[in-house]
Amino acid sequence: MRFEGEKIVVIGGSSGMGLATAKMAVAEGAAVVIASRSEEKLKKAAAQIKGSVQTQKVNIMEESSVRALFDKVGEFNHLTTPGSEAAMGPFLDLDLPTARKAFDSKFWGQYLAAKFGAPRIRPGGSITFFAGIWSQRPVPGASVIAAINSAVEGLARALAIELAPIRVNAVSPGIVDTPIYAAMAPDRKEAMFKEVSASVPAGRIGKPDEIAQAVLYLMRNGYTTGSTLYVDGGRTLR
């Protein structure tokens, strides 16, 4: 098993791509720590993971909470940070507090995770951030998230140099079928997925397991650092 004897921290590991990553890592022998704000979601996620898993509550928008998380976790091998909030809407209509909250979650949250997690990473370890394809192919209504994703990719490149030999990369998913869309009306969700599927060379929406595979690849490949891996069904080509 590739990750036997290693500890992996997944912030945002209670659902979606984070949960898929945690499951896959445990299946490959890792001891996993999943962290998120909701204790209830953490308990449900832990029940789905067959193997060594610990849960920790954290608010990635609070520096003291992130610092406390890594004080509890101690030394580990790999960190990934898929959990965050987003802000969508027309640029001229989107209020500043909403935009700032999204930055606090997706950019500053990952920044804090790297800041307090990096000193605990064992030799040969890595950090894998989460960005998104709108950094490369923005659409109307996604100006804030496009800017955040670009900032995350830039942070990964900069920290790959500054934190070396810790490897730092980013995964940039396309549209993936996760619980984030659960609040949408079923017919609206189906229409959106159909439209996106028709626009990408792969001809379909992504699956959480496919993003998890990309994350584990970046963890295990010792010669990949400072890279952004686009897992988007070819969306960046159109």
Question: What are the residue ranges of the model-derived segments?
Answer:
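Conserved glycine-rich cofactor-binding loop
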Residues: 14-16
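C-terminal substrate-recognition "lid" of short-chain dehydrogenase/reductases
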Residues: 204-231, 236
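Rossmann-fold cofactor-recognition segment
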Residues: 49-64
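Short, small/polar-rich loop/turn modules that mediate ligand/substrate recognition or access, typified
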Residues: 165-167, 225-226
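Catalytic Tyr-x(3-8)-Lys segment
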Residues: 189-210
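Substrate-binding pocket helix/loop in short-chain dehydrogenase/reductase
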Residues: 66, 90-91, 98-103, 192, ...
